[in-house]
């Protein structure tokens, strides 16, 4: 595979690799990649799949899913969620929580991910959309969970 940096062509042999923690423009103040540019770059690097894991939301999932399929890439749907002790408690010590990446591995996982993100906004919002371990226990089926970052 070759990539171009300006007029310089660089040949690289890259093993199969898939990004599983990607923020788009829907992760305000943290993601700059537009979905079309993400698809273009993934194809340039010879990737066969790519994930979307925006902060606390799934606003770009439909656009991402359609764009990935159109580009011949496997879309992996996910979200970076904030986990606190009690998502209903409005306490300054419970604002940020730990960060987790949740990826849907099947349709049941997608439905559970949508439920978790919805609850984070409708029941758990306090500065940020939040869930707790009890919700995660209830809606874990079909999900892959990973630490997200240094905040995880």
Describe the residue ranges of each PLM region.
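Phosphodiester-processing cores and adjacent nucleic acid-binding clamps
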Residues: 3-152
């Amino acid at each position: 595979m070759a990539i171009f940096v300006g007029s310089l062509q660089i040949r690289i042999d890259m093993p199969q690799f898939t990004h599983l923690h990607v923020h788009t423009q829907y992760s305000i103040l943290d993601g700059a990649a537009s979905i079309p540019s993400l698809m273009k770059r993934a194809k340039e690097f010879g990737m066969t799949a790519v994930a979307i894991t925006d902060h606390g939301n799934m606003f770009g999932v439909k656009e991402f899913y359609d764009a990935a399929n159109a580009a011949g890439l496997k879309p992996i749907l996910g979200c970076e969620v904030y986990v606190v002790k009690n998502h209903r408690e409005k306490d300054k010590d419970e604002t940020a929580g730990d960060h987790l990446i949740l990826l849907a591995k099947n349709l049941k996982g997608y439905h559970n991910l949508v439920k978790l993100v919805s609850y984070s906004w409708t029941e758990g919002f306090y500065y940020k959309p939040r869930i707790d371990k009890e919700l995660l226990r209830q809606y874990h089926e079909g999900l892959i969970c990973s630490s997200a970052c240094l905040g995880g």
